[in-house]
Curated annotation (Swiss-Prot):
This is Cytochrome b. The gene is MT-CYB. A ubiquinone binds at residue 201. The cytochrome bc1 complex contains 11 subunits: 3 respiratory subunits (MT-CYB, CYC1 and UQCRFS1), 2 core proteins (UQCRC1 and UQCRC2) and 6 low-molecular weight proteins (UQCRH/QCR6, UQCRB/QCR7, UQCRQ/QCR8, UQCR10/QCR9, UQCR11/QCR10 and a cleavage product of UQCRFS1). This cytochrome bc1 complex then forms a dimer. Belongs to the cytochrome b family. It comes from Glyphonycteris daviesi (Davies's big-eared bat). Component of the ubiquinol-cytochrome c reductase complex (complex III or cytochrome b-c1 complex) that is part of the mitochondrial respiratory chain. The b-c1 complex mediates electron transfer from ubiquinol to cytochrome c. Contributes to the generation of a proton gradient across the mitochondrial membrane that is then used for ATP synthesis. Heme b b566 binds at residues 97, 196.
């Protein structure tokens, strides 16, 4: 008798995606982050759902409702800090996942890659709106500054900002709509994840060598299920340590002060995972130019496949490209650091140099290096 998992209409979809899926035999731990991101999304939706049961999206009560969750709700503090730090883990896994894609040439699966970029934007939008909800000082001023950037768009900018705000400033209408969208977007993200997986399973996974692995495949279960469980345990250990020992490590102390439109914090900055893009924004003295740099710092991922000039897919056997890749990583870390610093020397010039390097590496140096490597290999 054929196993039910292979015949049942619903189970056979799950079976072909997670059980009998043929996978390359050489996948390293860098291929764990897809499953970790799935777990992060599930954790965020579950904790968020329970938080939403106690949260009120009104400017007069939002801050107090978060305090009420932490003080009076059973394990409310745990839910709140799991949700806040879960977002940080989400972005750590997301950036490592994208870095893996860049290093091993996974971006040549253009459909999967483009859905991934859409996912990145959707998750970033969700995280930004979620940061506004506790209605602390940094929530309010972060929302004001970031939404105000849209006013740089010629002709329609001011109208667009007021339309998003629902008035002439960030107020009750803004908070209510941000809560509505913050609740809705994770489900759109879940749908996009399914499309992402659908496109991935059309082609099969890439592997560290970048060479076709059709002749050497192994079943996903038990080999990669057990490997993913190990990765999951490590991630949950890190998340638990963060939540239970140092829950405010990655947050901003200003957000423990209720929002006050009459008092601007000395240094307005977004959450750490947006700082690299924020540093790109600040490194250009012109408002519209800064906004374009901010958007392009993420949208540049969409043109990476078009700039792939190497005859090899992966960077595994390309030492010059590897050096550039790790330089790019250090530039991104530098931008993240600069984004959290005040706007004064020497931080301004460091940020500008790092921004130029960021775009230079991705747009010019990497394609040129690939051509040089082709020449050295006489290809």
């Amino acid at each position: 008798m054929t196993n039910i998992r292979k015949t049942h209409p619903l189970l056979k979809i799950i079976n072909s995606s997670f059980v009998d899926l043929p996978a390359p035999s050489s996948l390293s731990s860098w291929w764990n982050f897809g499953s970790l991101l799935g777990v992060c999304l599930a954790v965020q939706i579950l904790t968020g759902l329970f938080l939403a049961m106690h949260y009120t999206s009104d400017t007069t009560t939002a801050f107090n409702s978060v305090a009420h969750i932490c003080r009076d709700v059973n394990y409310g503090w745990l839910l709140r800090y799991l949700h806040a730090n879960g977002a940080s883990m989400f972005f750590i896994c997301l950036y490592l996942h994208i870095g893996r894609g860049l290093y091993y040439g996974s971006y040549t699966y253009s459909e999967t890659w483009n859905i991934g970029i859409l996912l990145l934007f959707a998750v970033m939008a969700t995280a930004f709106m979620g940061y506004v909800l506790p209605w602390g000082q940094m929530s309010f001023w972060g929302a004001t500054v970031i939404t105000n950037l849209l006013s740089a768009i010629p002709y329609i900018g001011t109208d667009l900002v007021q339309w998003i705000w629902g008035g002439f400033s960030v107020d009750k209408a803004t908070l209510t709509r941000f809560f509505a969208f913050h609740f809705l977007l994770p489900f759109i993200v879940t749908a996009l994840v399914m499309v992402h997986l659908l496109f991935l399973h059309e082609t099969g996974s890439n592997n560290p060598t970048g060479i076709s692995s059709d002749s050497d495949m192994i079943p996903f279960h038990p080999y990669y299920t057990i490997k993913d469980i190990l990765g999951l345990l490590i991630m949950l250990a890190i998340l638990s340590a963060l939540v239970l020992f140092s829950p405010d490590l990655l947050g901003d102390p200003d957000n423990y002060t209720p929002a006050n439109p009459l008092n601007t914090p000395p240094h307005i900055k977004p959450e750490w995972y947006f700082l690299f893009a924020y540093a790109n924004l600040r490194s250009i003295p012109n408002k519209l130019g800064g906004v374009l740099a901010l958007v392009m710092s993420i949208l540049i991922l969409a043109i990476v496949p078009a700039l792939h000039t190497s005859k090899q897919r992966s960077m595994m056997f390309r030492p010059l490209s590897q050096c550039l890749f790790w330089l790019l990583v250090t530039v991104l870390l530098t931008l993240t650091w600069i984004g959290g610093q005040p706007v004064e020397n020497p931080f301004i010039i460091i940020g500008q140099v790092a921004s130029i390097l960021y775009f230079l590496i991705l747009l010019i140096l990497m394609p040129l290096t690939s051509i040089i490597e082709n020449y050295l290999l006489k290809w």
